[in-house]
């Protein structure tokens, strides 16, 4: 199975798999059962921003999800990613719908990683920014139902021609270049990611959510991972 570390923006509480009974953000380490969650007031139809940071000195993964009106949620979890992830990874965004549905629209996405090594005092860095997404976005690997180019956005899950979200959909977008996320001689490994998103649903219960994830470089969508599994995990263990 793939090795996945993710920050989930979970719009639908699946209490049967350990979700709290409200929309939340969470940190997932190799399982959809979050290690840590925080309550999140998801604003239907409003553009939000997610900011994720990690630093190997503090060994802490943190995320803040906010809206322009100042409403925000914060979650952090202490983890040494050297012990969890392979040295080379890919970073991506994933989303799913199930019985209930929502649009999982990404308007922008940026990422920076730095690796400072002892031996050479050099810093290896990878940086990318998407302020919009074109129809033929060559530097993204699109999986499942993900598409780019509609209004310059990335749609992670299926949307009909009139803009209505579709159920039982899953899609992911990964940056094409592998990221050197850690190495044994590194003094500091750090990264930060930011994306802006729009979740819109005609349902009283939007579902299921968006995640920023880091995975082994050959990761693909597990079969049956629509709905509560967010396109990331093969099961709810």
Swiss-Prot record:
Concanavalin A-like lectins of the Diocleinae subtribe undergo proteolytic processing referred to as circular permutation. The propeptide is split into an N-terminal and a C-terminal part, the gamma and beta chain, respectively. These are then religated in beta-gamma order to form the mature alpha chain. The beta and gamma chains can often be detected in cell extracts. Residues 1-118 of the mature chain, as displayed here, probably constitute the beta chain in the propeptide, residues 119-237 the gamma chain. Optimum pH is 7-9 with activity decreasing quickly at higher or lower pH. PROSITE patterns: LECTIN_LEGUME_ALPHA (PS00308), LECTIN_LEGUME_BETA (PS00307). The keyword Manganese applies. Ca(2+) binds at residues 10, 12, 14, 19. Keywords: Calcium, Hemagglutinin, Lectin, Manganese, Mannose-binding, Metal-binding, Vasoactive, Vasodilator. It comes from the Eukaryota. Hemagglutinating activity stable up to incubation at 80 degrees Celsius for 1 hour but diminishes with higher temperatures and is absent at 100 degrees Celsius. Signal peptide: none annotated. It holds the Pfam family Lectin_legB. A carbohydrate binds at residues 14, 70, 98-100, 208, 228. One of its GO terms (biological process) is vasodilation. D-mannose/D-glucose-binding lectin which binds alpha-methyl-D-mannoside, D-mannose and D-glucose in that order. Also binds to serum fetuin and ovalbumin. Has hemagglutinating activity towards rabbit erythrocytes. Is not toxic towards larvae of the brine shrimp Artemia. Induces relaxation in rat endothelized aorta. Shows a transient edematogenic effect in rat. Binds one manganese (or another transition metal) ion and one calcium ion. The metal ions are essential for the saccharide-binding and cell-agglutinating activities. Homotetramer. PANTHER family: CONCANAVALIN A-LIKE LECTIN FAMILY PROTEIN, LEGUME LECTIN DOMAIN-CONTAINING PROTEIN. This is Concanavalin V. It comes from Canavalia cathartica.
